[in-house]
Design a protein with these regions (language model features):
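PLP-dependent amino-acid enzyme catalytic core
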Residues: 1-123
């Protein structure tokens, strides 16, 4: 979770994509996010607190908007506290790292960089 890049310098990509069933039957984006993320955390220490982490990270509205020409929807990614799409990923990553750090005496410093105006999402 904290490594960033894979050992070969690329991105981490799941070996398998689990089939997600009934993912849209939840009352909030945070609940849906926890259901979608759960298969990727199945053997991780955070799996038990995943719903709590999602509720903490996604404590804002994330509306789905229907597309005019198809039976599809678009998730609007500008409704977070900084109005940037990175509110979704950065806030979840920060919540996970903070939880992993709980109970440890050693201080953790997270250094991030941005090339645009979305850096506030990681703060």
């Amino acid at each position: 979770l904290a490594a960033g890049l894979a050992p070969d310098g690329g991105l981490y990509v799941p070996e398998h994509r689990p089939r997600l069933q009934h993912w849209s039957a939840h009352d909030s984006f945070a609940q849906t996010a926890a259901a979608v993320l759960a298969p990727y955390f199945h053997d991780d220490a955070l799996v038990q607190v995943l719903p709590e982490l999602c509720a903490q990270a996604f404590n804002f509205d994330a509306p789905l908007r229907p597309l005019a020409t198809a039976d599809d929807h678009v998730l609007e990614l500008f409704h977070g506290p900084t109005a940037a799409f990175k509110d979704f990923g950065a806030r979840f990553l920060a919540a996970c790292l903070a939880r992993l750090q709980q109970g440890r005496e050693r201080r953790l410093t997270i250094v991030v960089a941005t090339s645009g105006d979305t850096g506030a999402a990681g703060a």
